[in-house]
Amino acid sequence: SYFGLVPAALLGVDVKTLLDRAVTAAGYCRSCTPPGPGVVTGAWLGAILGKLAKAGRDKATFVLSPAIASFGDWVEQLIAESTGKQGTGIFPVVGEPVGDPDVYGDDRLFIYLRLDGDDTYDGAVQALQDAGQPVVRLHLEDIYDLGEQFFLWEMTIAVAGYRLGINPFDQPNVEAAKILARAMVSEYQEKGRLPANEAAPLASEALARFLDQAETDDYITLQAYVQPTPETDRALLSLRTRLRDRLKLATSVGYGPRFLHSTGQSHKGDAGNGLFIQLTSDATQDIPIPDEAGTTSSSITFGVLKAAQALGDRRALEDAGRRVIHFDLEQNVVTGLQRLAEGLA
């Protein structure tokens, strides 16, 4: 759409080449079976994802060449919103460091998107395949092959949704958190305070007790309603890696409220095998939101809105029977994350 193409063109992207690659993929996808060596069709790949998900390998784990790593954010939203509903779904795992074969269970399907000439993950992916993990390899000649990948994955997930018996084009659970968040904002405007979002003690022992509920084939999501910074990125990456290595469960990280529009649908609509760790912090700088455009009067701030969204999503998860724990990291986010990770070494 123009929404994405216009900024891309302004950044110097050769939009015609990008779209030409998408047209090529559309031509390939007219066939149910790959028309030649090295060619993947949406029907073929979608059938694989759907079949393996129904067999228990429902954690689609992406390994991406570093130059195309941001593609993971797009495909994560596509898969989670399209398939995570009616008690089923495919859980997308992006940004998780590639580990040794022994840190994975039998619920994974690895998808390796390799940019031509980049062998960064060749050895690690081959080790996973040698250990018996299923691996799908997708080769990109250059970054413009992302145009092909966009079309391929849209068709892939439509087919996978059909195999799972769900409609991949609706999002029935997204509105639940929004409704509750609006109710929290209304209460704040009436009473001057939000309902309490009770937090667990900020200690690794509290996290360990929560994780005692974990079962084989579960997954863990870190819901970080905090300011994104490089230091926070590293602390979250360390925590998720320790969780994965200790429990052998798939992990994901989402900054809130962004993730509500990417993986939020799946969190409430899938089979209920997620453990959700909600992380909040105090706003170091807050900005008032005008009640009406062109006015200076304000009854809430962005900090209040974010807190309401976090509380609304927690209530929506609990209403759906999900397992949730909340930690308030206050103002020192990185130190708080490190404290939680201490007991997971």
Where are these regions (language model features)?
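Phosphate/diphosphate-binding loops
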Residues: 112-139
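A structural-propensity feature for long, helix-poor, extended segments
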Residues: 111-114, 289-318
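Hydrophobic/aromatic beta-strand patches that form the interior of the parallel beta-sheet core
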Residues: 91-93, 109-113, 136-139, 275-277, ...
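Ligand-binding clefts of soluble mixed alpha/beta catalytic domains
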Residues: 143, 158, 164-167, 281-296, ...
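Conserved, well-ordered active-site substructure
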Residues: 259-296
